[in-house]
Amino acid sequence: MPIEIVCKIKFAEEDAKPKEKEAGDEQSLLGAAQGPAAPRDLATFASTSTLHGLGRACGPGPHGLRRTLWVLALLTSLAAFLYQAASLARGYLTRPHLVAMDPAAPAPVAGFPAVTLCNINRFRHSALSDADIFHLANLTGLPPKDRDGHRAAGLRYPEPDMVDILNRTGHQLADMLKSCNFSGHHCSASNFSVVYTRYGKCYTFNADPQSSLPSRAGGMGSGLEIMLDIQQEEYLPIWRETNETSFEAGIRVQIHSQEEPPYIHQLGFGVSPGFQTFVSCQKQRLTYLPQPWGNCRAESKLREPELQGYSAYSVSACRLRCEKEAVLQRCHCRMVHMPGNETICPPNIYIECADHTLDSLGGGSEGPCFCPTPCNLTRYGKEISMVKIPNRGSARYLARKYNRNETYIRENFLVLDVFFEALTSEAMEQRAAYGLSALLGDLGGQMGLFIGASILTLLEILDYIYEVSWDRLKRVWRRPKTPLRTSTGGISTLGLQELKEQSPCPNRGRAEGGGASNLLPNHHHPHGPPGSLFEDFAC
């Protein structure tokens, strides 16, 4: 009895596909529309890229010695560029800066600085009462006494007032000042204001920033010239050494701006009796860089409540504020020269607590009182010279004039002359030596020299990477699932790989391997157009 193979074959018309797609992997064989075109391969991208040498190294063409040399040249140039780029980046991250000096044109008028002076001796011996000596014993080293002699036991005195003691026993400028002239005009002690420092009662000339005196010419005779008597006979005798014991004789002087409080124990210079000291000044305007190039304090951060009592931020004001906070925290009081309205420390706390607290504070960048330099600063450069006074003739004259002997004149009198060298200010400004624009320019030059690339070339490479990555993701997301044969016996769609794994149609008498399955992969409908491809198969 004859055996038949019953199969149903369905064909559909479709445009011819490229030959390379005929061996596809797991594409649908039934009604599946062809997906979007695959992205360019590396060879195609290399042949169209603007990166020099990439087309010859990775483009289409035979592989040989020439291509190998181009690959080596490309890799060498790329390595050289990366090395230079790393060096440029390291140089930029060091934040180098330079200092530019710009001497300004002479001005007709220049504001004269503030001049603060202090006698090195804090307390006049003749002005100390028995109570003062008793309370200041630890500071001065003098033994307490009464009218009957030194008798420490059983003495009772009222509580001391440190402000009153300093004001009353300090050297009075009216007694020390023998002559005063400013720009050829007479001045007096009334032109000085009282200020308290670590040296006690001191005096500042031209202290008011709202009415600072002008200097209309440079050179000697156009500034401040004063003659002082330091009153060495009022210096305290030394019975024993203390932290406050001083062996010097003379005055301390600081030249500063009106907005800056005096910090004379560290920033002042000494003037000796028996000499005329000339101080030639030059105004300097300094501009520093903030982070990341420097460590200056920017103007936007100046308005802080910690600097109450000062019109502007300065290193001196910051230091005084920090010292005050430290003394307040440890001693529960403040020293006379510190700003604020808190309780003044009594003399015994000065030596037992306050002085030790100040000595423990560091002044460097690691200390608790680190104060950054303001980004805009005015200071006065100084050149100091001196000559000995008096000569023999003037010694006799001064002795008669002030009713003193010549020895006293030589040991106590001094002359201080402060003036502008010229009415010009010197501007010094920190500038970034290597900024971002310079870095980008150097990187662009190195990139063009070694690999012939630009920013647009980098965008081309990123665009190609995006195109390839996006195509891979879409393939993963849209991978078709293999449908199963329906229970109704309808037509099922089989993938090509699954079709190869399927057993042939049921055989009704043919020899094994003689089924129609061998015919199907390249089967064309006898009446169909020559471009038709196999699509549907049912068995």
From Swiss-Prot:
| Impact upon substituting residue 441 to A | No effect on channel function
* GO CC term (a single one): plasma membrane
Is Ion transport one of the keywords UniProt gives this record? Answer: yes
Which Cys-Cys disulphide bridges does the record give? 118-202, 180-187, 296-375, 318-371, 322-369, 331-353, 333-345
Q: Where is this motif: GAS motif?
A: 452-454
> Which GO terms label this protein's molecular function in UniProt?
ligand-gated sodium channel activity
The listed locations are: Cell membrane
Q: In which tissues is it expressed?
A: Expressed in brain, spinal cord and dorsal root ganglion (DRG). Expressed by a subset of sensory neurons in the DRG. Expressed by granule cells in the cerebellar cortex. In hippocampus, expression is detected in dentate gyrus granule cells, in pyramidal cells of CA1-CA3 subfields and in interneurons of the striatum oriens and radiatum of all subfields. In cerebral cortex expressed in small, medium and large pyramidal cells in layers 2, 3 and 5 respectively.
Q: Does the keyword S-adenosyl-L-methionine apply?
A: no
Keywords in alphabetical order, please. Answer: Cell membrane, Disulfide bond, Glycoprotein, Ion channel, Ion transport, Membrane, Sodium, Sodium channel, Sodium transport, Transmembrane, Transmembrane helix, Transport
Which residues point to the Extracellular side? 90-438
Q: What protein family does this chain belong to?
A: Belongs to the amiloride-sensitive sodium channel (TC 1.A.6) family. ASIC4 subfamily.
Name the job this protein performs: Does not exhibit measurable stand-alone pH-gated sodium channel activity but may form pH-gated heterotrimeric sodium channels. Its activity could also depend on alternative gating mechanisms.
How is the quaternary structure described? Homotrimer. Heterotrimer; with other ASIC proteins producing functional channels.
The protein's name in its UniProt record: Acid-sensing ion channel 4
